[in-house]
Amino acid sequence: MIVLKTLQFTKLTATALIITLALAMSFLVVEPILSLAIEDQFTITQSVTAEISFLTAATDITMSPTIAGLTGGTSNGQTQVIVNTNNAAGYTMTIVASSSPAMQGNTGGGSIPNYTPASASIPDYTFAVGANTGEFGYSVSASTTSDLAQKFLDNTTTCNTGSADTGTLTSCWYALSTTATSTINRTTATAASGATTTIFFRVQITANPAPAIPQATYTATTTLTATAT
């Protein structure tokens, strides 16, 4: 009887072991399927628009010194703007006068004639006014020379050619117009500190202008427009 019970116990033990092993094998087969990772990939999109602003806007200018109406003289002034844009294609800037001639007398109806370059569409490298007259003109300089519109670039002797900005205050003089004139053509975004443009103005009256330029205070109202391209 002892031997029989031992055999029965052994069979039971073996059966239990087989069942346990079977369950373990089932777990090994099923569990990897249950524990595999799955992925769900997606994107988040945010659009950022281009903007442009004046970090520093142009200020009003008082030309200096005053000019004697008969003996004549030369007067200068300047203003500066700083433009900031994140537009990858950069920006353009134009200048336009509100009247023609641009420099109008505040009283009496007089005016100072616009500058007359030797070629109607090309600035003069030097500011030159003929005898017995007076004229008002402007020039443009940029902190990044390549930003300048081509007509304000020079080859050290002639404007609208070359890639230099020679002499700044002494080069590439042009006449204000009631038609917008391109001054800046930048092709990249600016740094956070912006891009600087300086505009110089000059009035020169030669001796005994004819017709006479009446005694008055003269004002030219101009507008700069910067546009993201």
Predicted feature descriptions by range:
Residues 1-39:
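Sec-dependent, cleavable N-terminal signal peptides
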Residues 31-229:
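Signature of Gram-negative chaperone-usher
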